[in-house]
């Protein structure tokens, strides 16, 4: 997945327009497959709907797309870019210094967005495959829902299985396919609208408001739970800002919006003209002439796969950002593409696959899945509204205007949340359970890191310069390695983790020519790659602070190679010639990376709550990437040392010597 060139971020191009269609609009663009079907089924079927119901439903869809997608996301949220990156975690990095509690909406929003990513592929692919029921030559096969489920699971298995290889080649087809899809939505919807041209009156919000309070509406205000399905992809639109640029979204959204609205109008007109067609039909596929149905099902399936791919890739990006912000466990990641935007996280991939397939097997039909869909994303949108309000205040927007915006969208999205909450007992509990589980994991990881940073002891490195220099020249000890490198996330100025000095001095003393202490600091900018060096007035101690953006790979060995070369060229680091080497001109000696594997001991004297957090974090850590993989050290010389997380002085346990009393004979 490519990232837009920063110089053209606000510009639009023909190529960018097509790319945006393939990346940004998959979710929102496939909503016509199931939204109208959900509305009609909740009303009692096609035979139960009236003209006022159809006009009101389409009106509510149009104004939901306008208020939430167009105004909130396209016009407001897209301005909240973190160095041209969007999404809830990018937004959080912009405002997190304003108040500590903003971590709460960030974690909740990220978790619910991730849980939504597990449901979207299930709904979209199942809806598309169910279209085969109206293909005359295949009806005898796919009228049996078990065959629909089998085909859906097969497509999902292929989709998740190819993630490890990246989408570089086939990804180039996504844009053109989605252009054809949206063109089809618009044209077919427009042509179907001639069956009942009155549907275009739905642009008047009066019909939507009238339906909400009309006795004809069997669901009352809870109809908004189905209406919301039309705009679930709005959050993904913001998340993909960095991939296509603001300019291309601004230009492509009107085209997409018109195509989607025409599709809803066409379906509505067909329903009013065919009220005796049968209650089990999906209006989207039923409104297509039979000779084109097979072609449309294939196109819809491709669009559903592209939408699912966008959600899966978005989930990888979301988790990757959370890991670098230290609010998510560091799972093993690979980069199958040629550019930094393509990330593959095996644990997340197969977690999503397991959840998605379980949802298909549990709910069986797209209609039942729709009953669970939308609840999680309403929570994400509410959390985005909170963070967005703080961003606008930070940018100097008048607090009164920000308050009005927050109240307006808070009430609007709150109503959608309440309308969707009724879905909880009809399947919504599944995504809520997933979201709560993710929130639990993120909270444990975040709190655990805070506990460690609060208790772990730091030492002043200046106090040990003499010992390190003496060790370098102590002939009683053999040379351990020319360069010894310690990676640490706890280095503040000259203060360094006690475990590191314990490893060098108190265990088998590690004699080296140069001691390196490398600390990685993740910046709020996504693509920073800078470093700072402090040699503390010596030529044998090198403190390195690596400043890497939250989207950058933390491949330390490759960055260190560049730093060493620059230090040698500047003369700050003495040359380290090798006697034996395939490179006679080599100026650098051998390197040994020391990775400290910190283990929590249950014997530590912590409060019960803190003990529980640390025990849970230790359990989760078994599933995470090793530091060797995380820091890209697979092909380097590495020693892993297991050290305890020492929160208090390690005192001996009380014990007394047993003395045997001996008696002597008279």
From Swiss-Prot:
GO terms for cellular component: plasma membrane. It is found in: Cell membrane. GO terms for molecular function: potassium ion transmembrane transporter activity; symporter activity. InterPro entries: K+_transporter, K_trans_C, K_trans_N, Kup. It comes from the Bacteria. Keywords: Cell membrane, Ion transport, Membrane, Potassium, Potassium transport, Symport, Transmembrane, Transmembrane helix, Transport. It is a multi-pass membrane protein. Its main location: membrane. The chain crosses the membrane at residues 16-36, 58-78, 99-119, 141-161, 167-187, 221-241, 253-273, 292-312, 343-363, 373-393, 402-422, 424-444. Transport of potassium into the cell. Likely operates as a K(+):H(+) symporter. Belongs to the HAK/KUP transporter (TC 2.A.72) family. This is Probable potassium transport system protein Kup. It comes from Streptococcus agalactiae serotype Ia (strain ATCC 27591 / A909 / CDC SS700).
């Amino acid at each position: 997945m490519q990232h837009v060139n920063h110089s053209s971020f606000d510009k639009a191009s023909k190529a960018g327009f097509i790319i945006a269609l393939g990346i940004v609009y998959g979710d929102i663009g496939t909503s016509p497959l199931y939204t109208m079907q959900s509305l009609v089924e909740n009303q009692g079927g096609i035979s139960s709907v009236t003209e006022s119901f159809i006009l009101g439903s389409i009106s509510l869809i149009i104004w939901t797309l306008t208020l939430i997608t167009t105004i909130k996301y396209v016009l407001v949220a897209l301005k909240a870019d973190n160095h041209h990156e969007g999404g809830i975690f990018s937004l959080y990095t912009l405002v997190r210094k304003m108040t500590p509690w903003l971590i709460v909406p960030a974690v909740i929003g990220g978790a619910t967005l991730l849980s939504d990513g597990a449901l979207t592929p299930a709904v979209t692919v199942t809806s598309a495959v169910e279209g085969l029921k109206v293909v005359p030559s295949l009806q005898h096969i796919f009228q049996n829902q078990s065959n629909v489920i089998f085909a859906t699971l097969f497509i999902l298995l292929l989709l998740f299985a190819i993630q490890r290889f990246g989408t570089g080649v086939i990804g180039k087809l996504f844009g053109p396919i989605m252009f054809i899809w949206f063109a089809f939505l618009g044209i077919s919807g427009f042509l179907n609208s001639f069956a009942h041209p009155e549907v275009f009156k739905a642009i008047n919000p009066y019909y939507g408001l009238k339906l909400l309070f009309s006795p004809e509406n069997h669901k009352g205000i809870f109809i908004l739970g189905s209406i919301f399905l039309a705009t679930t992809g709005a959050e993904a639109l913001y998340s993909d800002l960095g991939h296509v640029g603001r300019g291309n979204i601004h230009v492509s959204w009107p085209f997409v919006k018109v195509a989607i609205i025409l599709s809803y109008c066409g379906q509505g007109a067909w329903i009013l003209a065919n009220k005796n067609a049968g209650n089990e039909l999906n209006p989207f596929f039923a409104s297509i002439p039979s000779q084109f149905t097979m072609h449309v099902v294939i196109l819809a399936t491709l669009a559903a796969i592209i939408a699912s791919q966008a959600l899966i890739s978005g989930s990888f990006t979301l988790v990757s950002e959370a890991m670098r912000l230290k609010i998510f466990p560091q799972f093993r990641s690979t980069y199958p593409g040629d550019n930094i935007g393509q990330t593959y996280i095996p644990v997340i991939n197969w977690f999503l696959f397991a959840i998605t397939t379980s949802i298909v097997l549990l709910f069986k039909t797209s209609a039942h899945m729709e009953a669970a869909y939308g609840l999680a994303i309403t929570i994400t949108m509410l959390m985005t509204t909170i963070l967005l309000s703080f961003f606008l205040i930070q940018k100097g927007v008048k607090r009164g205007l920000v308050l009005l915006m927050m109240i307006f969208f808070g009430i609007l999205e709150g109503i959608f949340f309440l309308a969707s909450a009724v879905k909880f007992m009809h399947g919504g509990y599944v995504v809520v359970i997933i979201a709560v589980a993710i929130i639990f994991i993120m909270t444990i990881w975040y709190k655990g890191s805070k506990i460690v940073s609060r208790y772990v002891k730091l030492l002043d490195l200046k106090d040990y310069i003499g010992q390190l220099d003496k060790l370098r020249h102590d002939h009683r000890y053999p040379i351990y390695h020319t360069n010894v490198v310690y990676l640490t996330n706890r280095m503040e100025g000259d203060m360094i983790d006690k475990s590191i000095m314990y490893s060098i001095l108190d265990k088998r003393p590690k004699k080296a020519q140069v001691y390196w202490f490398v600390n990685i600091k993740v910046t709020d900018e996504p693509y920073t790659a800078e470093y700072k060096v402090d040699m503390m007035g010596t030529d044998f101690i090198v403190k390195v602070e690596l400043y890497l953006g939250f989207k950058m790979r933390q491949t330390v060995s490759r960055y260190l190679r560049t730093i060493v070369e620059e230090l040698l060229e500047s003369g700050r680091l003495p040359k380290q010639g090798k006697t034996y080497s395939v490179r006679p001109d080599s100026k650098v000696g051998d390197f040994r990376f020391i990775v400290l594997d910190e283990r929590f001991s249950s014997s530590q004297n912590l409060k019960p709550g803190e003990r529980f957090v640390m025990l849970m974090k230790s359990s989760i850590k078994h599933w995470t990437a090793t530091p060797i993989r995380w820091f890209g050290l697979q092909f380097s010389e590495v020693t892993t040392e297991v050290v305890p997380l020492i929160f208090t002085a390690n005192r001996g346990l009380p014990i007394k010597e047993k003395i045997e009393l001996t008696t002597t004979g008279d």
